[in-house]
Regions:
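Terminal amphipathic alpha-helical/low-complexity segments used for targeting or macromolecular assembly
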Residues: 1-6, 51-56, 76, 155-156, ...
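Conserved N-terminal catalytic core of the sugar/cofactor nucleotidyltransferase
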Residues: 2-15, 23, 37, 41-134, ...
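Conserved beta-strand termini and adjacent loop/short-helix elements that scaffold enzyme active sites
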Residues: 108-110, 164-165, 252-254
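Conserved core of the sugar-phosphate nucleotidyltransferase
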Residues: 141-221, 226, 230
């Protein structure tokens, strides 16, 4: 399973989108949390765009019940396009058309919410025997070049799986999966272990896992035989720890901007930050914020 093979380019990505979005109820009672907009663009579109900008051309979205709106968003909308064309709204017509041409997007349903590892496993037939990326929808990562593009380059240079890490305050390490490093590695990028939400004061570092992975397909065999952990879920971290015994996993130390849009405060911050960067909104938003804070 772990014999050396010719390195392949990373062209496929998995975006897990099966969660119930309970933190955003009642807004998510009848719509996917992934479709909640950051101003005028749903959160999941930012994730898809990062994948495409990083060289991904085929994406599988692992969804659940009541997620049809995601499929509709990335599909062609004949009626809307016709309406925009008749109104002469060429700018918006181009934006709407571009959405359906971002990438080849496929869908598979995760029939039960059995954890991130299970969601990744649901895409096994689509991925086959190729290296692949995983992008979590709660994390909008912003950097130039994109985080995933840098990780793919690292994978293609080394042939090793890569996990994105971000430095967090020590008093916040209990909220994240935390990496321990192999001190014998001169690059200090070889991950020795992954500890899921260590107890306060027990973290081996303050480098936390954020929602980007580039993985060898060997992970599927480990996920297939993984034992359910807490709440009966199959955890990706457990199988990554096993993979690390046979094939080195490397860190990509992300230093850009991360928005946690799976958290209410993070969602509000993301909306404000994106608004402040837009020519059509920034001046009025700054004015409003100054008025509110004075």
């Amino acid at each position: 399973m772990f014999h050396e093979k010719k390195r392949q380019q990373v062209r496929k990505a998995i975006i897990p989108a099966g969660g119930l979005g309970t933190r955003f109820l009642p807004a998510t009672k009848a719509q996917p949390k992934e479709m909640l907009p950051i101003i005028d663009k749903p959160a999941i579109q930012y994730i898809v765009e990062e994948a495409v900008q990083s060289g991904i051309d085929s994406i599988i979205i692992v969804s659940g019940r009541h997620k049809r709106a995601i499929e509709d968003h990335f599909d062609k909308s004949y009626e809307l396009e016709k309406e925009l064309e008749e109104r002469g709204n060429e700018e918006m017509l181009a934006i709407v058309r571009d959405i359906s041409h971002l990438a080849d997007i496929y869908y598979v349903r995760q029939k039960e919410p059995l954890g991130l590892g299970h969601a990744v496993l649901c895409a096994r037939r689509f991925i086959g025997d190729e290296p692949f990326a995983v992008l979590l929808g709660d994390d909008i990562l912003r950097s130039e070049p994109p985080c995933l593009q840098q990780m793919i380059h690292q994978y293609e240079e080394t042939g090793s799986s890569v996990i994105a890490l971000m430095e967090v305050p020590w008093n916040q390490t209990h909220k994240y999966g935390i990496a321990a490093f192999d001190n014998a590695d001169p690059s200090h990028n070889r991950i020795l272990d992954l500890i899921e939400k260590p107890a306060p004061g027990q973290a081996p570092s303050n480098w936390a896992v954020v929602g980007r992975y580039v993985l060898d397909p060997a992970i599927f065999e480990l996920l297939e035989h993984a034992r359910p952990g807490k709440a009966g879920e199959i955890q990706l971290t457990d199988s990554l720890q096993q993979l690390n015994h046979f094939a080195p996993i490397l860190a990509h130390r992300f230093t850009g901007k991360r928005h946690d849009v799976g958290d209410k405060l993070g969602f509000v911050k993301a909306t404000i930050d994106f608004a402040l960067e837009r020519e059509d909104l920034s001046e009025e938003v700054r004015k409003y914020l100054r008025e509110r804070l004075d």
